Amino acid sequence: MVTRSAISNMYKIFIIILLLIFASPVQANDSVMQKRSLWPDHIKLQYAGGIGFLSLGSGYENRRKNLQADLYYGYVPEKLGGVDMHIITGKFTWLPIRTKKWKQLHIRPLTTGLAISYTPGNQYFLFDPENYPYNYYKYPTALTLGLFIGGQVQRPIGKRSKSIGMYYELGSNERALSNFVLNSRTISITEVFHLALGARFQLK
């Protein structure tokens, strides 16, 4: 039987491994990023997906156009989340398959990546509050680690590489996955995964 302490240790190791995996391509492209303008390469608007009811983000992609790094601000209104939630998310997206062209569409059939979200507020914390025993909460309530897989399609508009497109993502996070492992008989698979739909505006 899988225990909560085992899940907690697996979670910590999981985070370290993922950060190492995603840090290597980012570091390799640091010199490229420094030479480019600070103006973002694209803007994204996302619906759902675990980072807010609606989220607005912007970010950069490398020259090979197979890695994107974005920063999002997401909002969940009180009537949906019980309290107003403001969520800051850093998302790293890897596009391992080259662009497939069909008529005027540029299709990326596979995207995958990592999202790290922080939710500020008195009811959320990174470490156990002083009035609770050590490791009372197995996961920090203010921090969420998510994984996703999806795809995107772009359509060029005008000149200078500008385009507009849409993307989808199917994802989950560490809490939902661990709860499913511990309580697979009572938790439906539909409660573990979430779907995101978004629009992407290429600026340069």
Range-by-range predicted roles:
Residues P40, I51-F53, M85, T144, ...:
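Membrane-spanning beta-strands of outer-membrane beta-barrel proteins
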Residues M1-Q34:
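Bacterial Sec-dependent N-terminal signal peptides
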Residues Q34-R36, L54-Q68, H86-I97, L195-F201:
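Feature captures outer-membrane beta-barrel proteins of Gram-negative bacteria and organelles
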Residues K65-A69, R98-K101, G158-S161:
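Repeated loop/turn-to-beta-strand initiation elements of outer-membrane beta-barrel proteins
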Residues W102-K204:
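Outer-membrane beta-barrel transmembrane domain signature
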Residues Q34-W39, L67-G74, L126-P133, A176-N179:
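Flexible, solvent-exposed coil segments and beta strand-coil junctions
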Residues K79-G113:
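Mid-chain, structured segments of secreted extracytoplasmic proteins
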Residues S37-G50, L56, L67-K79:
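Transmembrane beta-strand segments that form the barrel wall of outer-membrane beta-barrel proteins
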